[in-house]
């Protein structure tokens, strides 16, 4: 492993830990060095490799789009185990360039390292729970590595799926699912007889495995419909409205089964499905016009929001949140404004803010902590502990901000007559129970 990767890894792990409220890994790889090519879904751009790298035991090298490798960034990306992959739209001889990259991949696999590849090649502008058609690169690289070693070493391919409740929302949740690996050595005879066919067949097999690790909606235009059913039922992967009695894994499985059920209506759509879709659309449009969130309406309907407990939490967190604001708020505002102005595609915002935050907040606070430690005549280790605690103070600030926002929203909603919306929601709950199977 390169030294910068080793140094940055614990900081990135902390950043991911702070960003997501809960992370669950299913079938996590057992070994750090196992010559495996991980084929992952690309739902959230730069966030995907960050969360996989920090929640996977394996030492990973990342295949990254070549246009981010500039004169300035190339040394840093190299140090972070990133390798460029060239696409036709990059305006270069992709075959020649990728041959060089494939050789580096072969060298990494020969050294018992692992690769993380995103065969879809791109990320949707808007977060959608689906897998786009994948390319053959992962399988091709695996067989190139096997030929280079004269088939003496085992090379594996495994599907990995990142399931976000919402990737750009801090304190949301994430479930990472890993498939059992495919050993490419088992296909030597077929490969030597007809390499093109075997690569195509195995790519299809990997695509099926990748879909099994995530929620996959065939019809892109039904993504909103799928999300709305999850919100009303409370059983799915929505990050705001969900039943807390269901574990994240159960909610993920519900999301998958719901999508698979909707995918069965590829040709003829039953009248009751179209009717439900229309009713949901009307309900959420009225919520939007009223500037009300469904989670708040549900809390009011169920009388589940306790303003007193929320106020106690705010008071308890206030001293720590104040320290968090003093140490982090100004850099945070700079990062937020810079990222949202620089990157037009919002899919990049969450990961870029997280990475920039890790570096800029550290650079901003190191001299402050050093001066404080010296001024108060404290030993180095006290300053170090305080520096680490700054991230917890910032988390307190984020938590108190969310609680205050909820308090303001709930105070506002209490003044509204929401009877009509409550009745609409109750009717939708009943309709979903009647129409959607009990998964």
Q: Positions of the model-derived regions?
A:
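Soluble catalytic domains of membrane acyltransferases
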Residues: 3-197, 206, 304-305, 321-439
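General structural signal for secondary-structure boundaries
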Residues: 94, 215-223, 266-273, 300-303, ...
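Short, well-structured alpha-helical interface segments that form or flank functional binding sites
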Residues: 137, 201, 314, 318
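Long, charge-rich alpha-helical interaction segments
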Residues: 197, 204, 208-298
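Membrane-proximal, non-transmembrane alpha-helical segments
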Residues: 263-342
């Amino acid at each position: 492993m390169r030294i910068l990767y080793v140094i940055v890894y614990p900081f990135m792990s902390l950043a991911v830990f702070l960003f997501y409220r809960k992370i669950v890994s299913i079938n996590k790889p057992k070994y750090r060095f196992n010559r495996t090519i991980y084929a992952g879904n690309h739902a959230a751009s730069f966030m995907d490799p960050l969360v996989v790298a920090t929640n996977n035991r394996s030492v990973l090298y990342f295949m990254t789009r070549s246009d981010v490798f500039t004169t300035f960034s190339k040394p840093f990306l190299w140090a972070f185990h990133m390798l460029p992959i060239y696409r036709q739209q990059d305006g270069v001889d992709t075959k020649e360039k990728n041959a060089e990259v494939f050789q580096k991949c072969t060298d990494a696999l020969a050294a018992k390292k692992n690769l993380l590849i995103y065969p879809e090649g791109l990320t949707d502008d808007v977060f959608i729970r689906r897998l786009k058609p994948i390319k053959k690169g992962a399988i091709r690289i695996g067989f190139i590595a096997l030929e280079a070693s004269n088939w003496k070493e085992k090379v594996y391919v495994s599907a990995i799926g990142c399931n976000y409740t919402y990737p750009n929302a801090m304190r949301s949740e994430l479930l990472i699912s890993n498939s059992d690996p495919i050993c490419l050595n088992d296909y030597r005879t077929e490969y030597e007889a007809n390499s093109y066919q075997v690569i195509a067949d195995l790519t299809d097999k990997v695509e099926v495995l990748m879909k099994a690790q995530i929620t996959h909606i065939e019809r892109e235009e039904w993504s909103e419909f799928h999300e709305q059913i999850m919100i009303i039922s409370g059983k799915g992967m929505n990050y705001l409205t969900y039943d807390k009695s269901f574990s994240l894994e159960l909610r993920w499985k519900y999301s998958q089964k719901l999508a698979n059920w909707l995918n069965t209506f590829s040709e003829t759509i039953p009248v009751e499905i179209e009717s439900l879709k229309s009713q949901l659309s009307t309900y959420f449009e009225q919520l939007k016009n009223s500037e009300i969130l469904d989670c708040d309406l549900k809390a009011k309907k169920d009388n589940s929001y306790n303003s007193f407990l929320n106020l106690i939490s705010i008071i308890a967190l206030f001293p720590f949140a104040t320290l968090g604001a003093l140490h982090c708020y100004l850099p945070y505002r700079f990062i937020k404004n810079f990222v949202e102005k620089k990157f037009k595609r919002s899919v990049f915002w969450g990961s870029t803010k997280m990475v920039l935050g890790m570096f800029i907040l550290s650079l901003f606070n190191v001299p402050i902590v050093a001066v404080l430690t010296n001024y108060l005549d404290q030993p180095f280790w006290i300053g170090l502990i305080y520096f680490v605690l700054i991230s917890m103070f910032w988390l307190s600030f984020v938590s108190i901000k969310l609680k205050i926002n909820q308090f303001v929203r709930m105070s506002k909603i209490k003044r509204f007559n929401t009877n009509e919306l409550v009745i609409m929601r109750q009717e939708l709950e009943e309709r979903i129970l009647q129409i959607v199977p009990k998964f």
